């Protein structure tokens, strides 16, 4: 018997535009299943359908059969589905509500009326599995530790089907590899693991099945290596379009310290106009700090950062303008930057003109939202 099975599933949010069409997939126990595809194609929607969030919390028109352990979940309440399907969402901060690791893990177990003895045992098991300590303060955890905590909290409740929505988003390479290795071990122990993820280079060595979501369809990928090569080539080809020779930013001997602790030291490099730059490094090494320095949200303790920005559409920046008007910052959590009630109002809120806002919306494929 499969853990999850979708038969002839169609879904739309408004009854008109279909998000998913004729989905037929089967996910067995004992396997790590990857759901991949471009943003906006319907991966998270698929998660919401399997977990019962659709239609219990999020409205929409759904047809077909969604089977969990061979039983159609149509008409079941969310609480009934959640007893069989655990969900780990992307943003750990939105899921952590307790002060300590112990209390956070215990919270879900208490809601399921576990005995105190069973709760204590579950905490011991998942803390050991996820390399956490009972007494740790949640607010002091790193991004990677928070991700492990919300995964541990889900596992402690005992569901054998676990879905993780982009669990590697806040993890460095080491942390991502460790989490995927743990998920691989859980699958070998009989769990059904479903991972929605973009970081194919990290996840593919750990997964058994790959499902690609595109153009409303969900397709099982047979050749994982070929799939990774095709996706990587697509990214590389896009990067070839960009080149530059003159400097946009110049950093010279830049250092940044907090309470006499060096976060960055003697950073010197140039960023060219028209270029794409990727900052790589382990969690806590200073990547975000460096971005905050470049965007002038922080000022360096030592050294200089100079800029020479020409607007892409021909309006030359003046030195009299404030730095924040020249450098845009997109945060990791979009909830920190969304304020307006509709997509159109959000895009036009700070735009230099409505026409330019419409152009950008079309380029990013969100004009119809």
Label each residue range with its predicted role.
Residues 36-38, 280-282:
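The feature captures the beta-strand-to-loop junction immediately N-terminal to the Walker
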Residues 162-166:
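Catalytic Walker B motif of ABC-type/P-loop ATPase nucleotide-binding domains
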Residues 197-198:
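H-loop/switch region of ABC-family ATPase nucleotide-binding domains
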């Amino acid at each position: 018997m499969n853990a999850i099975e979708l038969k002839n599933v169609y879904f739309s949010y408004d009854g008109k535009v279909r998000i998913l069409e004729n989905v037929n997939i089967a996910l067995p126990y004992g396997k790590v299943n990857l759901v991949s595809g471009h943003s906006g194609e319907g991966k998270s929607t698929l998660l919401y359908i399997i977990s019962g969030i659709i239609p219990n919390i999020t409205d929409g028109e759904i047809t077909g059969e969604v089977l969990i352990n061979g039983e159609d979940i149509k008409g079941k309440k969310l609480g009934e589905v959640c007893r069989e399907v655990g969900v780990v969402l992307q943003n750990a901060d939105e899921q952590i509500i307790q002060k300590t690791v112990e209390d956070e893990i215990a919270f879900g177990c208490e809601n399921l009326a576990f005995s105190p003895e069973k709760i204590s045992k579950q905490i011991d098991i998942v803390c050991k599995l996820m390399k956490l300590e009972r007494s740790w303060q949640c607010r002091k955890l790193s991004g990677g530790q928070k991700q492990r905590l919300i995964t541990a909290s889900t596992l402690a409740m005992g569901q054998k089907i676990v879905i993780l929505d982009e669990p590697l988003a806040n993890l460095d390479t080491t942390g991502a590899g460790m989490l995927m290795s743990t998920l691989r071990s859980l699958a070998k122990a009989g769990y059904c693991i479903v991972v929605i993820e973009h970081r194919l280079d990290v996840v593919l060595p750990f997964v058994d099945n790959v499902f690609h979501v595109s153009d409303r369809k969900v397709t099982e990928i047979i050749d994982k290596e070929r799939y990774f090569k095709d996706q990587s080539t697509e990214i590389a080809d896009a990067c070839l379009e960009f080149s530059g020779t003159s400097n946009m930013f110049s950093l010279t001997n830049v250092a940044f310290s907090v309470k006499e602790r060096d976060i960055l030291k003697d950073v010197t490099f140039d960023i060219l106009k028209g270029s794409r730059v990727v900052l790589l490094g382990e969690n806590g090494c200073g990547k975000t700090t460096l971005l905050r320095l470049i965007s002038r949200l922080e000022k360096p303790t030592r050294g200089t950062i100079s800029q020479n920005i020409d607007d892409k559409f021909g309006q030359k920046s003046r030195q009299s303008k404030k730095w924040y008007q020249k450098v845009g910052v997109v945060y990791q959590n979009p909830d920190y930057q969304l304020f307006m009630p509709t997509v159109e109002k959000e895009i036009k809120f700070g735009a230099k003109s409505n026409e330019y806002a419409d152009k950008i919306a079309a380029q990013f494929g969100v004009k119809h939202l």
